[in-house]
Regions:
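N-terminal ligand-binding/catalytic initiation module
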Residues: 1-158, 353, 397-398, 405, ...
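Glycine-rich phosphate/diphosphate-binding loop of Rossmann-like nucleotide-binding domains
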Residues: 77, 82-102, 154, 160, ...
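Terminal amphipathic helices with adjacent charged low-complexity linkers/tails
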Residues: 146, 154, 223, 387-417, ...
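Adenosine-phosphate binding glycine-rich loop
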Residues: 161-162, 181-183, 286-392, 396-402
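Long, charged amphipathic helices and adjacent flexible linkers at domain junctions
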Residues: 408-436
């Protein structure tokens, strides 16, 4: 990854139109008639329809594709409590990712308050405007309370990405890492470093994936979360308190199969890594610098699967693989919530996609680096366009099956095609060609069957059900 200098970042944000986002028109406004339709008197007609049937807001307004990114700036990634205004570039950046990866529109809303009840009151009042709420960079434990209260009363999805985004991606990585090393999820010992929003949520999600609660140990700045501990405790930590003699991270790491870090740089030593079980799995997800660097971890031992939050190392656990596609699926079925079933579906979709052959277009986007399921490739890459198709479809399906979808999708194959069409006419044309090929199958012979490109092309033909091997 190229070095990003301070001035580069400042120039990027200040050159030309300031910031990173704008509002674009979706209807023509070139004539007097256009303006009369867009505003008065024509606008009165959709208003009347929505008054008679509130769900028509999804038909006549942008509500169904609009998400609020809400923050008070109390836990901004790598910067801490910098306040609402200073956190605005991050929230605009979140909007960029929503649009780039899932074609979702965003208004960023920065709230100048530390009062969780005031945040709850304001966000509740915004429900008519948005199809979903993404809570961002709000410190723990207030973030748990805010999300819980909003989910109780709002009829649109509310999602705290700092909690659940990390868990989905790391959960997918965990499933694949365990498969590679041949360990069963209900047998492994897992140690968490960090008991904030991401740490607590990760621990809960790993249990839903199959980790035994008694095999999970939570460690914070005060040490191991054990039964009877008084210092630095809250109800969310109490849930994970266990009977143990371990008191430090070093104690907890002895014999551990998995380390999941969402804490701070450098808390894991080489000696701790050496004390873990064979074929250890280390997810050092602290940003911007991991709990231990891959260089130090592999210097301690070679039988590792290592993931970090950084793009300059293999196996980047990046939230951008989660929230855009999760919301895409949720919005497209008019979901009333993002529930555990949808999050699990997203994790399983990512896990399965990582085992598929990687297209040339993705390889080129990452400089031609070989990407094949294994220790250095346990989760898909963010620029893989298939993530949208796999994850959003899985989420939409889970929403329907779990009863939170207000607008079920009858044909999921057609839905996948519609997702592709969001990102350009060339993909629409390709889908038409694929459909025609399916309707009139031909016998195809590849004389260069030993070539890697031909093998990949053959796999795509098989996946698209254009032809079957003889």
């Amino acid at each position: 990854m190229a070095m990003i200098r301070k001035q580069d970042a400042l120039d990027y944000h200040s050159t030309g139109r300031k910031g990173k986002i704008e509002i674009a028109l979706t209807k023509p406004c070139a004539t007097q008639r256009d303006l009369s339709l867009a505003y008065t008197p024509g606008v009165a007609e959709p208003c009347r329809e929505i008054y008679a049937n509130p769900e028509d807001a999804y038909k006549y307004t942008a509500k169904g594709n609009l998400v609020a990114v809400v923050s008070n700036g109390t836990a901004v990634l790598g910067l801490g409590d910098i306040g609402a205004l200073a956190g605005k570039p991050v929230m605009e950046g979140k909007g960029v990712l929503f649009k780039r990866f899932a074609d979702i529109d965003v208004f960023d809303i920065e709230l100048d308050t530390h009062d969780p009840d005031e945040i709850i009151r304001i966000v509740k009042a915004l429900e008519p405007t948005f199809g979903g709420i993404n809570l961002e960079d709000i410190k723990a434990p207030e973030c748990f309370y805010i999300e819980e209260e909003l989910k109780k009363t709002m009829k649109i999805p509310v999602f705290h990405d700092d909690q659940h985004g990390t868990v989905i991606i790391s959960g997918a990585g965990l499933l694949n890492a365990l498969e590679i090393v041949g360990k069963k999820i209900d047998h492994v010992k897992v140690v968490f470093s960090g008991a904030g929003a991401a740490g607590i949520a990760c621990a809960k999600f790993y249990i839903k994936l199959g980790v035994k609660r008694e095999n999970l140990m939570l460690v914070d700045t005060k040490g191991v979360v054990y039964k009877g501990r008084k210092e630095g405790m809250n109800p969310y930590k109490e849930y994970f308190a266990i009977d143990t003699n371990a008191r430090t991270l070093a104690d907890a790491m002895k014999g551990a199969d998995v380390f999941a870090g969402v804490s701070v740089k450098g808390v894991v030593t080489k000696e701790m890594v050496k004390s873990m079980a064979h074929d250890a799995i280390i997810f050092a997800m602290a940003n911007p610098d991991p709990e231990i660097t891959p260089e130090d971890a592999f210097d301690a031992r070679k039988d590792l699967i290592m993931a970090t939050g950084r793009s300059d190392y293999p196996n980047q656990i990046n939230n951008v693989l989660g929230f855009p596609f999760l919301f895409r699926g949720a919005l497209d079925v008019m979901a009333t919530a993002i529930n555990d079933e949808m999050k699990l579906a997203a994790a399983y979709a990512l896990s399965t996609l990582a085992k598929e052959d990687v297209p040339d277009s993705v390889l080129k986007a990452y400089g031609g680096v070989r990407l094949k399921f294994g220790r250095d490739y346990i989760i898909p890459k963010p620029l893989d366009p298939r993530v949208l198709l796999w994850e959003a479809t899985a989420v939409a399906k889970a929403a329907m099956e779990s009863g939170v979808a207000r607008k079920p999708i009858a044909d999921l194959d057609a839905y996948r095609d519609s997702l592709e069409s969001r990102f350009g006419r060339s993909k629409q044309i390709m889908r038409v060609l694929i459909h025609k090929a399916r309707e009139a199958p031909k016998r195809i012979v590849f004389p260069e069957g030993q070539e890697e490109k031909i093998l990949r092309a053959s796999q795509i033909i098989l996946d698209e059900e254009i032809a079957m091997p003889i």
